[in-house]
Amino acid sequence: MAFTHEKIETKSWLMIALILVVIAFGGLVEIVPLFFQRSTTQAIEGVKPLTVLQLAGRDIYVREGCYNCHSQMIRPLRAETLRYGPYSVAGEFVFDHPFQWGSKRTGPDLHRVGGRYSDEWHRLHLRNPRDLVPESNMPAYPWLEKATVAADAMPAHLRALRRVGVPYSDDEIAGAADAVRGKTELDALIAYLQSLGLARK
């Protein structure tokens, strides 16, 4: 007599047991390999950790709330890729802690803004956006060119990021304060904006 599915379907406890075995096996096949990966997302070619000045700029970007109006994630939609460039992939964000994807766009997406405009354009735009884009509702940030970067805080910041997997070397950490000493917050923010999206064009 051949084995048929009818024997399983008519014995509810056997069917429940077999369902649990299949689910457990499927779960193991999906989950166990992740224990052997250092990271579930690998960096794409060309993605590097931010320099100390860029990292200081990222901190200013977060402090000033830029993420409330600008996203940093291009969705795989034709209209977005035509306007902003290639859609974002997970491997571009492996060194972002926390990532700056955003969920609202009052202003344009900034993920591929690096190299699109000159440093001077950014300087003028951050000083007073309406000088370059008359219809802009972005606030001006004139104080950024007067304030200097908190250089002494940077080594601890790099050490903290290294603890969560960003590959900063001991030399980079030791020289972090000197790398940004005397730089303005405007210089740092521009350096950060110019670094966005360069790994994938």
Where are these regions (language model features)?
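The canonical Cys-X-X-Cys-His
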Residues: G57, R63-Q72, L189, L193
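Short, solvent-exposed loop/turn and secondary-structure capping segments
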Residues: G27-L34, S71-M73, R78-R83, N137-M138, ...
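Short, well-ordered alpha-helical packing segments
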Residues: V29, L55-R58, H111, R123
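Post-cleavage N-terminal segment of exported redox proteins
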Residues: M1-L50, V164-S169, I190-K201
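Bilobed periplasmic-binding protein/Venus flytrap-like ligand-binding cleft at the lobe interface
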Residues: Y61, H125-P129, A191-L196
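Sequence context of c-type cytochrome heme-c attachment sites
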Residues: L34-G46, V52-L55, S71, Y87-F93, ...
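Electrostatic cytochrome c docking/interface patches
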Residues: R38-V62, I74-T81, T106-P108, A176-A179, ...
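Electron-transfer interface patches adjacent to heme c in soluble/periplasmic c-type cytochromes
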Residues: M15-A24, L82-L186, R200
